[in-house]
């Protein structure tokens, strides 16, 4: 299923949340309705962690992660790091990265097996991403945009990318990532799909302005429809069991 939500009248859900198969980060300071949408769907399966990064609420922009790990910028405080480590499942590694392009959520997009990264990230950053997230790493652009995390969102089951992505690149990326991909939008025609959407292998959250057509594409490409509901439940249960 896919659900709509808002963070203090902002529809850029991906700016204020980071969702994986093992945990969900949500920004401090949101409304109860915002938190309730996430906790109602996730709290029985994975921890929903209220967090800030360097005192900033845009946790989705600043972090990248999957079921294996969480990457945060170097200016994350010691207190914030400790809170994250305490709240995350024991199997999830949490690592600071000293990187000039510190909005990691904008420069990295990943699932549990592979990551696409901004072409200009440091080579040391690339190694840390590979080691912490346990993924194959590829430098790439999407529709000639270097901010791959802003213009794409992927899971182990599918991905949504910038609406102007050419068919040839869609095919290339789909082969590379080994998942089906679609070019599309969220929030009524917004190309910033990574900013307007968070999704894991069984549930998605979009901004309130996301249309029914956009929501349907999200549910289909990420295989979240009713026809895959039992499969999604099995996936969720398997992931949760592996984390316990």
Each predicted region: which residue ranges?
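The feature marks the mature, well-folded catalytic cores of soluble enzymes
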Residues: 1-244
